[in-house]
Amino acid sequence: MKRTRRALPANYDPVYPYDAPGSSTQPPFFNNKQGLTESPPGTLAVNVSPPLTFSTLGAIKLSTGPGLTLNEGKLQASLGPGLITNTEGQITVENVNKVLSFTSPLHKNENTVSLALGDGLEDENGTLKVTFPTPPPPLQFSPPLTKTGGTVSLPLQDSMQVTNGKLGVKPTTYAPPLKKTDQQVSLQVGSGLTVINEQLQAVQPPATTYNEPLSKTDNSVSLQVGAGLAVQSGALVATPPPPLTFTSPLEKNENTVSLQVGAGLSVQNNALVATPPPPLTFAYPLVKNDNHVALSAGSGLRISGGSLTVATGPGLSHQNGTIGAVVGAGLKFENNAILAKLGNGLTIRDGAIEATQPPAAPITLWTGPGPSINGFINDTPVIRCFICLTRDSNLVTVNASFVGEGGYRIVSPTQSQFSLIMEFDQFGQLMSTGNINSTTTWGEKPWGNNTVQPRPSHTWKLCMPNREVYSTPAATISRCGLDSIAVDGAPSRSIDCMLIINKPKGVATYTLTFRFLNFNRLSGGTLFKTDVLTFTYVGENQ
């Protein structure tokens, strides 16, 4: 009998026919579809599938899950407290009197337990589902409210501020001689000054006139003296008479002295008598009252102690025989004129007082040459930040470098992005709300040394980003090498640093955000020691 040749498989390789072992052609023969198999090839084994498996001793066993157990070779349910098996092999409650109780929102009706549904819930094909109301239309914001991302903010002008979460007007203080009343600012003027047509002017005293024996020469008043009188050491004295001589109307004839009389006089019975003169008339300011002649004093003059004096009002006084104006604080005399005293930062332009602009000198704010660990991430100081802001003309130049410490000393390609933020108030002073907030190592750099002057100045504002130019956040990105000197500038040792200008942040007026990106360009762990980064932006106005 001729043996039938077995057909070869389609993938049979006559060159390398031994890749996989073939089935055994030796007895015993078996049907692999009736519980037996070759595993491994050439070895007869029992073909089992879950829940049947083999024990550690090679015996066939039944795998059991939770709630099932084997007891003396029999599979049975594992019963918990309160459950038993009755005589019919059914699982039942051990004590029917101990039934389950239900509380809201569960309710039992005969043999059915149901769930009470309130608003916002519904039963959909036996599944509890939450129903959501139709969402309202999106909110629209109009100026002065602005929306950036998920934040609504209110831009503030210089005259406004936020205190304890409330919007208010920034109070303005005024020093004498300026005074604020209600909504007006006025200049308090003392005696001798007045405001005419919104200009400060001096009140001129009335002109003074002098009658003999008083006479005025330039700015001096003098007393004219006649014979027998003189002024010595500022006092009026009588001079000794010269030898007795007689002049008209006296006449000496030998030892007789006679009086020559003229019109209006005569000698009668050895007595000098007056002949009635014609009636006298008096012109203003002289007036005759009965037998007295008096001087009538007009406005600005008065008679005191028998003397004619000038009446002085507020702002005028008698000083060393002259009348002068009395000036208060903030005023002075210069070249016989009353002028306002001006302190630093004030000048007079077109007859009005105005503040002067400070000279445009370069200003530098910095952390000092060797700052402390002043950068915080998750409230932990881990970055040593050197930052220098220099205002020259209208531009501010930023020089910065960063060195990691602790957990950020070495960074890897899986490092997450992170930001270091400086927040400033409306005066350009560093706030404590950012994560670069060490005010002990932030201030102004003097010209002559490398110290930090932390005392704030009104010029610090000049180093801030111009809010009108950067009314919305602006950004610039720069390639940043890490440990460049040690790795000789290898391109696989660089990341990106993005400077974000004036990104809204809390109550801060100005912000500078240094964001470090693209760590996945690193080829491995690298020392976080950045190159010196340089940025430029337009500075704020004074």
Swiss-Prot record:
The keyword DNA-binding does not apply. The keyword Transmembrane does not apply. It comes from the Viruses. One of its GO terms (cellular component) is host cell nucleus. Keywords: Capsid protein, Host nucleus, Host-virus interaction, Late protein, Viral attachment to host adhesion receptor, Viral attachment to host cell, Virion, Virus entry into host cell. Transmembrane segments: none annotated. It is found in: Virion; Host nucleus. One of its GO terms (biological process) is cell adhesion. It holds the Pfam family Adeno_shaft. Induction: Expressed in the late phase of the viral replicative cycle. InterPro entries: Adeno_fibre, Adeno_fibre_knob, Adenobir_fibre_prot_rpt/shaft, Adenovirus_pIV-like_att, Attachment_protein_shaft_sf. Residues 1-24 are annotated as: Disordered. Its main location: virion. SUPFAM superfamilies: Fibre shaft of virus attachment proteins (SSF51225), Virus attachment protein globular domain (SSF49835). All late proteins expressed from the major late promoter are produced by alternative splicing and alternative polyadenylation of the same gene giving rise to non-overlapping ORFs. A leader sequence is present in the N-terminus of all these mRNAs and is recognized by the viral shutoff protein to provide expression although conventional translation via ribosome scanning from the cap has been shut off in the host cell. Homotrimer. Interacts (via N-terminal tail region) with pentons. Forms spikes that protrude from each vertex of the icosahedral capsid. Interacts with host receptor to provide virion initial attachment to target cell. Fiber proteins are shed during virus entry, when virus is still at the cell surface. Belongs to the adenoviridae fiber family. The tail region anchors the fiber to penton base capsomers, whereas the shaft, built from several repeated motifs, allows the knob to protrude from the virion. This is Fiber protein. It comes from Canine adenovirus serotype 2 (strain Toronto A 26-61) (CAdV-2). The lineage of its organism: Viruses, Varidnaviria, Bamfordvirae, Preplasmiviricota, Tectiliviricetes.
